[in-house]
């Protein structure tokens, strides 16, 4: 596994495994164990996923030492504000039977994220978290937070895929020394991404799948992708991206697919903000 060095010196795997929507406890534990066995070391969960306990059980059962794993969770907005955020992280540690998290993110850029972020800073100083960051913070919110804190976020996890390439986000995250991480690198299969002629053609050129091409494209842009699957053979396939390199021409060809639009929703849409803030997770 290759690694990125975050702005505080912590090393983070360049590819991670996400467990969003894997709610069944036994299935979640199985897929995390399979992912670790396949070679993943970065495991990404969240308070809102409802599977922290299952992920924790898998971590306890694996033979891979804890210090070789990079475990991420995210604080949901119902736990924002200084006190609630701090308590919620301790509760997540207890659920997962962990002494520390490698990374904790604020899940959404709404409500009292400044207060919640101050809680993460204190937990970071106490050694309960090795690195802190945010998720879904588009450039305006990221800059707002970065200019109002003593500890600049180490990571910002946002939607990035060939149809939503986040060029502006990459510029501003790089400017402030924030590592960009990609959720939904495959757009959850939307818009025919796996049968896209351009991506299929590039994959054939390197004898790689569309998924491998997308993950390689992200890695070459300096972005850490979070792949998600419940099939072990696909987990292994998604890690097999370090034996080839996309040409500059192919990188530009993929860049031409950008529609600069989310495959899911816009965090700038008032209706989306109302929906997210109304979720009681």
PLM region descriptions:
Residues 1-4, 53, 57-59, 89-91, ...:
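Alpha-helical scaffolding within the catalytic cores
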Residues 1-69, 186, 280-281:
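N-terminal binding-site loop/beta-alpha segment at the start of enzyme catalytic domains
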Residues 7, 85-105, 122-126, 178:
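CE4/NodB-like, metal-dependent polysaccharide N-deacetylase domain
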Residues 22-26, 46-54, 78-83, 109-114, ...:
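Acidic-and-aromatic substrate-binding clefts and catalytic sites of carbohydrate-active enzymes
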Residues 23-36, 80-96, 115, 140-142, ...:
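Short, acidic/polar
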Residues 40, 98-101, 129, 153:
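A structural motif
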Residues 66-79, 102-109, 136:
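A short, structured active-site edge motif that brings together acidic residues
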Residues 108-281:
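Beta/alpha (TIM)-barrel catalytic core signal, keyed to glycine-rich beta->alpha loops juxtaposed to Asp/Glu
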């Amino acid at each position: 596994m290759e690694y990125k060095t975050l702005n505080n010196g912590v090393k983070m795997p360049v590819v991670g495994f996400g467990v969003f929507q894997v709610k069944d406890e036994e299935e979640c534990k199985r897929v995390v164990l399979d992912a670790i066995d396949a070679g993943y070391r970065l495991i990404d969960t969240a308070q809102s996923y409802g599977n922290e306990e299952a992920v924790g059980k898998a971590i306890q059962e694996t033979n891979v030492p804890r210090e070789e794993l990079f475990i991420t969770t995210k604080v949901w907005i119902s736990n924002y504000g200084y006190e609630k955020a701090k308590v919620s992280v301790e509760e997540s540690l207890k659920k997962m039977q962990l002494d520390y998290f490698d990374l904790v993110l604020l899940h959404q850029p709404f409500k009292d994220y400044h207060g919640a972020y101050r809680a993460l800073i204190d937990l970071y100083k106490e050694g309960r978290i090795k690195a802190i960051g945010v998720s879904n913070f588009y450039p305006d919110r990221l800059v707002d937070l970065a200019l109002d804190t003593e500890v600049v976020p180490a990571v910002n996890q946002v939607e990035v895929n060939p149809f939503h390439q986040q060029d502006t986000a990459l510029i501003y995250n790089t400017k402030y020394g924030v590592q960009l991480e990609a959720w939904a690198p495959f757009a959850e299969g939307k818009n025919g991404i796996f049968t896209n002629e351009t991506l299929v053609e590039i994959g054939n050129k390197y004898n790689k799948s569309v998924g491998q091409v997308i993950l390689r494209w992200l890695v070459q842009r300096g972005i850490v992708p979070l792949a998600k699957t419940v099939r072990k053979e696909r987990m292994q396939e998604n890690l097999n991206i370090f034996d080839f390199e996309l040409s500059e021409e192919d990188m530009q060809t993929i860049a031409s697919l950008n529609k600069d639009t989310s495959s899911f929703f816009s965090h700038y849409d008032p209706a989306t903000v109302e929906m997210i803030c109304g979720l009681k997770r």
